[in-house]
Structures are given as C-alpha cells and as structure tokens.
C-alpha cells in the first residue's frame, strides 16, 4: 500500500543534512547511509550514496529517474546463485 499523500515523502533528517554538507563543499564523495527506507528527493540528484545492504555499502549514483523511489530499491540484500544443478545429469 502506498504512503498517504497528505503525509508527504519520508526522509531521515540526518540524510538531508549530509547531502547539503556535500553540496556546499563541492566534493564528490560517497555519502554512507543506512536508511534504506528514505525516499530519494530532487536535491539528491547528482550525488552518490553508499546504501547499506546488511553487509556492505553499495554505491548508488542518483539520477532524475530515481526521484520518488526508496534507496533500498537500488541495493539488493539477497544474492541469487541459481537453483542447484541436476545431480542425475552430473553423474553421467
């Protein structure tokens, strides 16, 4: 279910402060974040965030198409190795 319109998008407060600090400094560093639940805002476009996936920070470069989505959508938490090979075919 989508978030109610009257509430507006959710963004952790520290995230806005970090992004503004990097923009003011003019540096192009990776901003490490743990808030996968935060919505990507228009002022984040052009910045690179390191989104934590449970074991490491995945670099996510934000572009215009990502605005309105959540950071967690771009940093997968599970690794898929495929289904097990057919053991009968392997023996022959």
UniProtKB/Swiss-Prot annotation:
PROSITE patterns: RIBOSOMAL_S19. GO terms for cellular component: cytoplasm; small ribosomal subunit. Belongs to the universal ribosomal protein uS19 family. Pfam families: Ribosomal_S19 (PF00203). Protein S19 forms a complex with S13 that binds strongly to the 16S ribosomal RNA. It comes from Rhizobium rhizogenes (strain K84 / ATCC BAA-868) (Agrobacterium radiobacter). Keywords: Ribonucleoprotein, Ribosomal protein, RNA-binding, rRNA-binding. This is Small ribosomal subunit protein uS19. GO terms for biological process: ribosomal small subunit assembly; translation. GO terms for molecular function: rRNA binding; structural constituent of ribosome. SUPFAM superfamilies: Ribosomal protein S19 (SSF54570). Disulfide bonds: none annotated. Signal peptide: none annotated. It comes from the Bacteria.
